[in-house]
């Protein structure tokens, strides 16, 4: 072949290659891409995205957000209701008066502290309740600017607080006052009664059909339609620097977190415990004291604030769930999770792994929801397991007896209904859509910020509950995680007495010996030193009061005159579970007669004696201090102790002319009555 023929052949090959590339890649029509309009106006965004409903959440720990997404998913699946979930603080809602009257607003609102809005809902409440609020059309509150707007609302609260579900009630009242009309009942979820899930299901089952009627939407019961695509990427190593292995944010993964960025669950401080003690070990009960270094965190706390601990799930729980799903061999397989509708938010940071999702990002140790079991039933491996899951999902009494009362998690229920066959057909996306995300746990800081500005002290009883007749043990998530750190810190060969194991080294061994945490502000504040205080805190409820007394002792040591500081403390035995027993005497030595500790040991006599009984025994002292302007504090169990203490206080304050409960309310209104209960 001659030279020019070679050249001609090469040219033909090049042209053919170019044509192939152009025809198959460059000239390939692109799939239509749906983009969310960049605006902070809900009115504009809903119009641009052709949405029928906007679902808002006001959430402190993420629970209200989880419910909002669950509602959004079910509304789309069962009623074809086009909607999107929004964080209240991310949007300018002054133009809500221009909201399309043919559309719907839905609110999921948690109440925080003493009837306060969550941080991300504070501005929204101020907008609705402000006397000088002017909306975009120029209308004020008195002009009923929301006339014709329809809304639905579900609140998350705790009935043991006086201001039960105050946020939902306030927003509901404000929306009505502004002219809006509520669809369905005002949903009031009660976390204290353990009925939050059931309260939500009842409200949702009543409200969704009402919404369907409003928009002429027929309820459809179609097969499961995933919101997210879960794509396995076996070609990507789980050691790749791009894979999330438990990092709480993209900035954390990349290592470029701004030094002054606010601390939160997405940007926790990794604190080194500098001291740890087990204050008592009594049978199956033990109590921890941990001191966490925050010197380089950029955080500052005030006495009475919370230490927010970001836990992880124990390895045993992760293994159990992976095994029952048939994913144990794939635990380290890299997966990418993508929303099918680009309006939706990805539920986890990805790429990640199956192991990581269950270890760090989701709550897998808590009681499984009844609704999730009913969703899983069609994917059960056997007819028998399907039938059992359907019964658990549809019969609340049966579910309560066999799941709630035993504190069973998802893996434990699935293993019981199908001991031999794994749930290999269960879509992973269904779990991502319906399980709760991992949330921080709040612990009252047990130190004084004046005495220990660079250290946060945490006091916690390790949670363990055993049903010997059922061969089942429930372990508290965060307290057992902290116990593992405590044992690790002391270098014990058996790191955990309950046999639980944790990857304390964290992702890529970057957390070794450190606990992810941040400080959460509280309204539980120590009164000025010249104000008498009465504190009631049995068990670990004494934690914030240790900080209070510590601070007053510090002030007294500097010559500051301190008013009466009266502490009522209770536990089971004086020689077994008396927290900080020697320490109280040290404070007494400094504070002298201004400090008094009154104890109640419930099991040292034939009849039980609790702190409320001691209050009644010291009625005259308490009444006198209240008359002198004392502040009254309660910390601890909400279901029984707090109620009994309030009743005792009301009894003490009752006179011929004064109703005791009204007197307690007057203390609240005067900012002299504080509760921190759970």
Curated annotation (Swiss-Prot):
The cross-references to SUPFAM superfamilies, in alphabetical order and at most eight, read: Ferredoxin reductase-like, C-terminal NADP-linked domain, Flavoproteins, Riboflavin synthase domain-like
Annotated organism of origin: Schizosaccharomyces pombe (strain 972 / ATCC 24843) (Fission yeast)
Q: What highest taxon heads this organism's lineage?
A: Eukaryota
The Gene Ontology biological process terms listed for this entry are: ergosterol biosynthetic process
Subcellular location(s) per record: Endoplasmic reticulum membrane; Mitochondrion outer membrane; Cell membrane
Q: Which residues lie on this side of the membrane: Lumenal?
A: 1-5
Described by its record, this protein's role is as follows: This enzyme is required for electron transfer from NADP to cytochrome P450 in microsomes. It can also provide electron transfer to heme oxygenase and cytochrome B5. Involved in ergosterol biosynthesis.
| InterPro entries referenced in this protein's UniProt entry, alphabetically | CysJ-like_FAD-binding, FAD-bd_FR_type, Flavdoxin-like, Flavodoxin/NO_synth, Flavoprot_Pyr_Nucl_cyt_Rdtase, Flavoprotein-like_sf, FNR_nucleotide-bd, NADPH_Cyt_P450_Rdtase_alpha
Q: Where is the Flavodoxin-like domain?
A: 53-208
Q: Where is the FAD-binding FR-type domain?
A: 267-514
Q: Which residues bind FAD?
A: 441-444, 459-461, 476-479, 678
Assigned keywords, A-Z: Cell membrane, Endoplasmic reticulum, FAD, Flavoprotein, FMN, Lipid biosynthesis, Lipid metabolism, Membrane, Mitochondrion, Mitochondrion outer membrane, NADP, Oxidoreductase, Steroid biosynthesis, Steroid metabolism, Sterol biosynthesis, Sterol metabolism, Transmembrane, Transmembrane helix
Q: Which cofactor does it need?
A: FAD; FMN
From the Swiss-Prot or TrEMBL record, give the protein name: NADPH--cytochrome P450 reductase
A GO term, aspect molecular function = flavin adenine dinucleotide binding
Q: How is the cofactor bound?
A: Binds 1 FAD per monomer. Binds 1 FMN per monomer.
Tell me the CDD domains matching this sequence.
CYPOR
Q: Which Gene Ontology CC terms are recorded?
A: cytosol; endoplasmic reticulum; endoplasmic reticulum membrane; mitochondrial outer membrane; plasma membrane
Check the record and name the Pfam families matching this protein: FAD_binding_1, Flavodoxin_1, NAD_binding_1
Among PANTHER family, the record links this protein to:
NADPH--CYTOCHROME P450 REDUCTASE (PTHR19384:SF17), NITRIC OXIDE SYNTHASE-RELATED (PTHR19384)
User: What residues does FMN bind to?
Assistant: 59-64, 110-113, 156-165, 191
The membrane topology noted for this protein in its Swiss-Prot or TrEMBL record is: Single-pass membrane protein
Membrane-crossing ranges are 6-26
Q: Which family does it belong to?
A: Belongs to the NADPH--cytochrome P450 reductase family. In the N-terminal section; belongs to the flavodoxin family.
């Amino acid at each position: 072949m001659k030279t020019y023929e070679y050249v001609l052949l090469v040219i033909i090959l090049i042209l053919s290659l170019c044509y192939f590339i152009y025809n198959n890649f460059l000239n390939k029509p692109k799939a239509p891409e749906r983009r969310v309009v960049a605006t902070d106006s809900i009115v504009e965004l809903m119009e641009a995205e052709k949405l029928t409903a906007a679902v808002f959440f006001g959430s402190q720990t993420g629970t209200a957000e989880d419910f909002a997404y669950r509602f959004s998913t079910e509304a789309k699946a069962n009623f074809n209701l086009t909607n999107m979930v929004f964080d209240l603080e991310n949007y300018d809602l002054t133009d809500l008066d221009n909201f399309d009257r043919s559309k719907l607003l839905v609110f999921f609102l948690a109440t925080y502290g003493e009837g306060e809005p969550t941080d991300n809902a504070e501005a929204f409440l101020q907008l609705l309740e402000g006397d000088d609020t002017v909306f975009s059309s120029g209308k004020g509150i008195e002009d009923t600017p929301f006339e014709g707007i329809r809304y639905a609302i579900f609140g998350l609260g705790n009935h043991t607080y006086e201001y039960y579900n105050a946020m939902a009630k306030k927003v509901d009242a404000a929306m009505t006052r502004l002219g809006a009309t509520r669809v369905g009942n005002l949903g009031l979820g009660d976390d204290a009664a353990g009925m939050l899930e059931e309260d939500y299901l009842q409200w949702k089952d009543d409200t969704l059909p009402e919404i369907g009627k409003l928009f002429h939407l027929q309820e459809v019961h179609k097969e499961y339609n995933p919101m997210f695509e879960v794509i396995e990427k076996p070609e990507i190593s789980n050691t790749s620097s791009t894979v999330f292995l438990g990092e709480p944010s993209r900035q954390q993964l990349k290592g470029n977190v701004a030094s002054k960025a606010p601390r939160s669950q997405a940007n926790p401080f990794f604190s080194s415990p500098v001291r740890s003690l087990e204050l008592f070990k009594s049978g199956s009960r033990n109590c921890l004291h941990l001191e966490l270094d925050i010197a380089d965190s950029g955080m500052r706390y005030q006495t009475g604030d919370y230490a927010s601990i970001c836990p992880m799930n124990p390895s045993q729980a992760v293994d159990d769930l992976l095994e029952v799903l048939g994913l144990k061999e794939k635990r380290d397989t890299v997966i990418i999770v993508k929303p099918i509708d680009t309006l939706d938010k990805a539920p986890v940071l990805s790429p990640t792994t199956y192991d990581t999702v269950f270890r760090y990002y989701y709550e897998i140790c808590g009681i499984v929801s009844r609704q999730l079991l009913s969703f899983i039933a069609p994917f059960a491996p056997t007819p028998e397991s399907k039938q059992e899951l359907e019964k658990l999902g549809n019969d609340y009494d049966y579910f309560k007896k066999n799941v709630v009362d035993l504190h069973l998690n998802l893996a434990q229920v699935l293993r019981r209904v199908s001991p031999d066959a794994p749930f290999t057909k269960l879509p992973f996306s269904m779990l991502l859509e319906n399980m709760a995300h991992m949330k921080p746990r709040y612990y009252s800081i047990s130190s004084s910020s004046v005495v220990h500005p660079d250290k946060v002290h945490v006091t916690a009883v390790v949670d363990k509950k055993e049903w010997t007749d059922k061969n089942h043990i429930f372990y508290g998530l965060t307290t057992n995680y902290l116990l593992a750190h405590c044992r690790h810190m002391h270098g014990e060969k058996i790191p955990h007495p309950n046999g639980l194991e944790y990857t304390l080294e964290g992702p890529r061994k970057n957390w070794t010996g450190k606990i992810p945490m941040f400080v959460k502000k509280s309204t539980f504040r120590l009164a000025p030193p010249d104000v008498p205080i009465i504190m009631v805190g049995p068990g670990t409820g004494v934690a914030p009061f240790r900080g209070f007394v510590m601070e007053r002792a510090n002030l007294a040591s500097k010559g500051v005159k301190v008013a009466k500081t009266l502490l009522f403390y209770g536990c089971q035995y004086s020689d077994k579970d008396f927290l900080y027993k020697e320490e109280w005497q040290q404070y007494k030595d400094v504070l002298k007669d201004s400090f008094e500790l009154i104890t109640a040991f419930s099991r040292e006599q034939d009849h039980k004696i609790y702190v409320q009984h001691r209050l009644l025994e010291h009625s005259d002292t308490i009444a006198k201090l209240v008359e002198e302007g004392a502040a009254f504090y309660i910390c601890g169990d909400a279901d029984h102790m707090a109620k009994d203490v309030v009743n005792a206080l009301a009894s003490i304050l009752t006179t011929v002319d004064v109703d005791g409960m009204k007197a307690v309310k007057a203390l609240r209104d005067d900012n002299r009555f504080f509760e921190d209960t759970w």
